[in-house]
Amino acid sequence: MTQNLQMADRFDSSAVEQALYKHWEEQGYFKPTENPSLPSYCIAIPPPNVTGSLHMGHAFQQTLMDTLIRFNRMEGNNTLWQTGTDHAGIATQMVVERKIAAEEGKTRHDYGREAFINKIWDWKAYSGGTISQQMRRLGNSIDWDRERFTMDEGLSNAVKEVFVRLHEEGLIYRGKRLVNWDPKLHTAISDLEVENKESKGSLWHFRYPLANGAKTADGKDYLVVATTRPETVLGDTAVAVHPEDERYQSLIGKTVVLPLANREIPIVADEYVDREFGTGVVKITPAHDFNDYEVGKRHGLPMVNVMTMNADIRAEAEIIGTDGKPLTTYEAKIPADYQGLERFAARKKVVADFEALGLLDEIKPHDLKVPYGDRGGVPIEPMLTDQWYVSVKPLAEVATKAVEDGEIQFVPKQYENLYFSWMRDIQDWCISRQLWWGHRIPAWYDEAGNVYVARSEEEVRQKHNLPADLALRQDEDVLDTWFSSGLWTFSTLGWPEQTKELKMFHPTDVLITGFDIIFFWVARMIMFTMHFVKDENGKPQVPFKTVYVTGLIRDEQGQKMSKSKGNVLDPIDMIDGISLEDLLEKRTGNMMQPQLAEKIAKATRKEFENGIAAHGTDALRFTLAALASNGRDINWDMKRLEGYRNFCNKLWNASRFVLTNDKLDLSAGEVEYSLADRWIESKFNRTVGEFREALSQYRFDLAANAIYDFTWNEFCDWYLELTKPVFANGTEAQKRGASQTLVRVLEKLLRLAHPIMPFITEEIWQKVKGFAGIDADTIMLQPFPKVVKSELDESAEMQIGWIKELIIAVRNIRAESNIAPSKGLEFLVRNVSDEQRKILAENDRLLKAMAKLDSVQVLSADETAPLSVAKLVGNVEVLIPMAGFINKEAELARLTKEIEKMRGEITRIENKLGNEAFVAKAPEAVIAKEREKMQEYQNGLEKLQTQYQAIENL
């Protein structure tokens, strides 16, 4: 016999998780080795914002990453999970600006650039560790000594190196072009930071008089121009029509007089114009509209910028040529009464002035999308500004080919199309931002306006042989955050130095990210990496071999989680639990829109009337893995979280059954393995195969389901029960067989589940390892189970599968006939094959114990059975004699109900098959299936009627 141990009744995650994690980290289990002969496996984490906190999307993606990292570590690979945080320029600057405004009533300008940046570093030091601590709570097996920040010295050097090299290659340039301008934050922003909001607006129809006596085809001396933006009229430099629009073909090349400004502008033909929109004539304002900007370039139109950086009307128009340089040969004056007007006040005045001049044709309601800055919260303005750009086309060609050639795989594959659609129509990338927080652009200016690009001011002076007394001013702008994060996979490994880590772990293996940043981050990483990182043969390296694109975690109603909706769930609250009061405070405190607080509080009280219970990290991780389907949207499900917490307890209780069993015998001596022992080993190996196959395809949901199904349905519900008769009445050899199988399968199951459920599996494994004769420190460095083909036993699976069906049939009869589970029954079977007869004989004791049977008897085909309740298991008839058990009235009532149900099904199928439309449209296989079901129901009805007759005759 083996000394059993004590185990608590329930798994207490709060007592285990943080202590275990601390131990793992202190022991260095998360660190890679320096052994270059081991195959390496590396994942670079998408760096979360340094001042942020974990949300469910982070928890979701990081659970999947850690599952892969732990699996590969157990596979014997040298694993590195490279972590770090992003400086998140605009987001972090805004957080600190709001903080000093609220606490001190100051702006960043009161501080000045240097002092304000120091303030951000202080804030980063204070709050920057939050997200790292939360990641530890998730169980992430990260080498924290390698944690990086995008503004660390090493990464900053990599950023400068890339900028300087691209500039030297002529791929970075400075130019005046149109950008998304946030007039509140005073910075250019990326397309990702623009949110298009549906709005009910107007379409104004203005009359532009034709110049020089020209007339339209129907005799009018004006064109009616449709616009949604009257405030930009003063910047018009043309009107456009479609070249094939017969209404206006005769006017192409002629001019109109621009009202209010009184200057002539040409009528141009361009296929961009939609003939069905408005009147088919549109104004072209290249300095204030992205589409017009492209039209202007095609037709060589000047660009007239009429707005200041605040989006007010300028005192004097800025006139730029298509080459981006000031144009002195074109005149465009702004009337005095417009100068200084705020843009929407200018809109009203333009409309009023057109009306006063008799040039307002009509105003129509119009649904439109208005672009807003997602952080400034005001409509963005397309604005002509001096910015730095990367000419990305040459980089994009190489990056596109890498995916076309299969060097990089997208999973699911359809996301390749999204990638290609962007890469094949890529525009130059505006990389400068008018912020203070970020990587300052490594460019310097002298008083004459000359620009010098280098890694430092010292290098500028040396490179260009500049005198020490020549004043140089560094560019005020910083780089787009995506520029530095685009270098993430290689800058974190020490590039531009050729470090051993870069050699060992690059390219990384998989990137796990959301579909929303394929353009903004994934594509740029591929472009930058392939341009700057080469293998020993000079071939461009990819940053990762696979991009696994996850869906978006939404709330239970399918809504996106957001602070303004008040439906954000904190993963730490899923782990530790939270009271209703604290949850309300979290959801309604410090809101940008306090008027929503009452509505949010009401919804929260309804959904979480008792707050949220603690579920532990393993239950959270298992839920996230089980939800990880290939869908684009994934709805969170509290019920599943509860279910998987119960699953953790099921695993704990199964382990208690094994390890506290005083009959467990692991002593030396003769061992006999039963059919059930062979069956559970075979089922375990099939589960290992399913898990490995699922994980190889990034189907974490199927991997989790394989573990769940085996643990709950096979190991706990059946195998543990099948061992009880052995421990009660088996031989010593049979008990040893059951004992060894229990411990062996439990230990392997813990290793199988460990990548998804690290804490509970380590806690139990530490108790199991002694029983299993394992001398090792941690489960995470144990080998991951492999499929052992010699343990696959189809015969055992078939036999136990059939025995299970017989037992279930008896249990169902007990339940339906209201017979106590402890009451012994006679068990009769008819229509069995010779093989089935043999199985019954060999497993007589097992069947009796599991189904609580007094006897097992096989009837011949013509042998009459006593009055019995019958069930069909395949073709085999299971009969339980009812003498002394049955309540005649109750049984007849039950049978009547069953007969009615069966007749209802038959009628339903008859109606279906009698429906000509269904029969005409349905595939033949579907019709055949319905007919097959009909036959089954008719056979079942016949048996029920026979049974009814027999009981009625009692």
UniProtKB/Swiss-Prot annotation:
A GO molecular function assigned to this protein is: valine-tRNA ligase activity
Pfam families in UniProt: Anticodon_1 (PF08264), tRNA-synt_1 (PF00133), Val_tRNA-synt_C (PF10458)
Q: Which residues form a coiled coil?
A: 883-954
Recorded GO cellular component terms are: cytosol
- In chain numbering, motif 'KMSKS' region lies across 560-564
The protein's matches in InterPro entries, at most eight in alphabetical order, are given as: aa-tRNA-synth_I_CS, aa-tRNA-synth_Ia, Anticodon_Ia_Val, M/V/L/I-tRNA-synth_anticd-bd, Rossmann-like_a/b/a_fold, tRNA-bd_arm, tRNAsynth_Ia_anticodon-bd, Val-tRNA_synth_C_sf
List the ranges annotated as motif 'HIGH' region.
48-58
The UniProt record gives the binding positions of ATP as: 563
GO BP terms: valyl-tRNA aminoacylation
For this UniProt record, the keywords arranged alphabetically read as follows: Aminoacyl-tRNA synthetase, ATP-binding, Coiled coil, Cytoplasm, Ligase, Nucleotide-binding, Protein biosynthesis
What does the record give as EC number?
Answer: 6.1.1.9
Catalysed reactions listed for this entry: tRNA(Val) + L-valine + ATP = L-valyl-tRNA(Val) + AMP + diphosphate
Subcellular localization is given as: Cytoplasm
- Xref: CDD domains: Anticodon_Ia_Val, ValRS_core
Superkingdom of source: Bacteria
Q: What is known of its domains?
A: ValRS has two distinct active sites: one for aminoacylation and one for editing. The misactivated threonine is translocated from the active site to the editing site.
Role: Catalyzes the attachment of valine to tRNA(Val). As ValRS can inadvertently accommodate and process structurally similar amino acids such as threonine, to avoid such errors, it has a 'posttransfer' editing activity that hydrolyzes mischarged Thr-tRNA(Val) in a tRNA-dependent manner.
Family annotation (HAMAP family)? Val_tRNA_synth_type1
Q: How does it assemble?
A: Monomer.
Which family is this protein grouped under? Answer: Belongs to the class-I aminoacyl-tRNA synthetase family. ValS type 1 subfamily.
Record's protein name? Valine--tRNA ligase
Q: Which organism is it from?
A: Actinobacillus pleuropneumoniae serotype 3 (strain JL03)
